[in-house]
A protein has these predicted regions:
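Juxtamembrane intracellular "pre-TM" segments in multi-pass secondary transporters
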Residues: 168-204, 390-391
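Symmetry-related core transmembrane helices of the 12-TM Major Facilitator Superfamily/SLC fold
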Residues: 145-163, 359-375
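A late C-terminal transmembrane helix in Major Facilitator Superfamily
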Residues: 323-351
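Helix-to-loop junctions at the C-terminal end of transmembrane segments
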Residues: 39-53, 138, 252-264
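Cytoplasmic helix-loop-helix junction between adjacent transmembrane helices
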Residues: 86-125
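Structural signature of the two symmetry-related core transmembrane helices
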Residues: 56-70, 151, 267-281
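Loop-to-transmembrane helix entry
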Residues: 22-32, 230-246, 326-329
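Helix-loop boundary and gating motifs at the non-cytosolic
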Residues: 1-34, 202-203, 207, 212-226
Length: 391
């Protein structure tokens, strides 16, 4: 599913670069997709909360993602590429909350932290294998082979989702309403103002937005920087950037699961926010083939920890409200502001100032995340500890 959801993902930049695109327009089409996905995450989360057909949401959006990716083979015109990215992002906005909802519905709140940690470890393993195969196929047969691999993964993901028995999913538990909850009248979902009045949730969303403003563009730009300087094969080097990060993410996601259980989510997220400024510093200083190892290892630490801590913390903060998946979508929307702006900002900065300065600037954006997380520690630490240590 990891490979289906992203389409050709990080290979898009070098695919378009090989066809004469510059970094500015590449960043712009990525941002167009990010904005579309950002606009759809809250409606998608609300729909996931209400629907009893969560499996089919994953199936239909997965098919749309694969078809949208194939548009790029047909044409590399600006409007076609932008449309493909918009469609992929909209589909991806629904897949994330749907998988989280299915997980919560199967294992309930008590088992969510552990199961989500395992899910994310397997998710990163899938990305690792997919990147390795994509790199080899792109090197051996050309970049178009990557599109067909994404389609094959789509078939496998759909088969896996449909193998989950529908009766195994408790759709009330999937939205954060279990029998023992007394927080809401008549066991009904609380209003949307619950999200706006939840201060830890708002701080989390703002910190993630700052983080992704710096993080979103760094992977594709680093790949384009090294490949553009003739220091790496386009397909194989891009695959290496993904594989290094995903290998570290597997370990980081499992570590996050245990650390959250023992110490709460605040420390897990603090470490993840601290990784990005150091990553930007290293990326700006060393645009070399070997630089992929430290730069992408830090990406793996940050993203791997967040992949477990963010959905787990949101599920805890909104437990009993009936708005868990709306909350997931709302936080994804706010962080999506940063993630969607990052490629455009990074792309044009690279075109005007060069790659070195761009990486330093992107890494600097994450300092705002650290400031928020440490500055509001008194509010966040008790909230982040609640529920994380449940067996």
């Amino acid at each position: 599913m990891a490979d289906m959801q992203a389409g050709i993902g990080p290979f898009l930049g070098v695919f378009l670069q090989q066809r004469g695109w510059q970094t500015g327009p590449i960043g712009t089409v990525m941002t167009a997709g990010g904005i579309a996905g950002m606009a759809m995450t809250v409606p998608a989360g609300a729909f996931i909360d209400h629907t009893a057909h969560k499996r089919w949401v994953v199936v239909i959006t997965g098919i749309c993602t694969v078809l949208a990716s194939f548009l790029l083979l047909w044409s590399q015109a600006f409007l076609v590429v932008a449309g493909s990215q918009v469609a992929t992002a909209i589909a991806g906005a629904a897949i994330g909350p749907a998988v989280a909802g299915i997980t919560l519905g199967v294992v309930r709140q008590r088992g969510f932290n552990a199961q989500n940690g395992r899910n994310q470890a397997w998710n990163h393993a899938g990305n690792l294998v997919g990147a390795g195969l994509s790199g080899w196929l792109g090197w051996r047969f050309g970049m178009p082979a990557i599109f067909f691999l994404a389609a094959a993964f789509g078939v496998l993901a759909i088969t896996a989702v449909l193998s989950i028995p529908e009766r195994a999913i408790d759709h009330r538990a999937a939205r954060g309403l279990e029998p023992e909850h007394q927080a809401t009248a008549n066991g009904q979902a609380e209003g949307f103002r619950e999200l706006l009045s939840n201060k830890p949730l708002l701080i989390l969303a703002a910190a993630l937005a700052c983080f992704h403003l710096g993080n979103g563009a760094m992977l594709p730009l680093y790949g384009m920087a090294v490949v553009g300087m003739g220091k790496g094969d386009p397909a194989m080097f891009t695959a290496t950037t993904v594989m290094v990060a995903q290998a570290v993410m597997i370990v980081a996601s499992l570590a996050a699961m245990k650390l959250a259980h023992q110490r709460g989510y605040w420390l897990v997220l603090l470490v993840s926010f601290a990784a990005l400024p150091l990553r930007g510093l290293l990326a700006g200083a060393f645009i070399e083939h070997w630089g992929v190892w430290p730069v992408q290892a830090l990406d793996g630490i940050g993203a791997g920890l967040q992949s477990v801590a963010v959905p787990g913390l949101i599920a805890c903060l909104l437990d009993g409200t009936g708005r868990v998946n709306v909350g997931q979508g709302a936080v994804m929307t706010v962080q999506g502001v940063g993630a969607s702006l990052s490629p455009a900002i990074g792309g044009w900065l690279a075109q005007m100032l060069g790659y070195h300065a761009t990486f330093f600037i992107l890494g600097g954006f994450a300092l705002a995340s650290l400031a928020l997380w440490i500055g509001f520690a008194g509010t966040l630490r008790p909230a982040c500890a609640a529920g994380a240590g449940r067996p």
